[in-house]
């Protein structure tokens, strides 16, 4: 969910924005 977290869904948005 972070900027470069690379979560399961490949989302680049989150607390690391």
From Swiss-Prot:
GO terms for cellular component: extracellular region. Its main location: secreted. Keywords: Amidation, Neuropeptide, Secreted. Expressed in abdominal perisympathetic organs and abdominal ganglia. It comes from the Eukaryota. It is found in: Secreted. The keyword Secreted applies. Myoactive. Belongs to the pyrokinin family. This is Pyrokinin-5. It comes from Laxta sp. (strain Australia). The lineage of its organism: Eukaryota, Metazoa, Ecdysozoa, Arthropoda, Hexapoda.
């Amino acid at each position: 969910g972070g900027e470069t977290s690379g979560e399961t869904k490949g989302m680049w948005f989150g607390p690391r924005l």
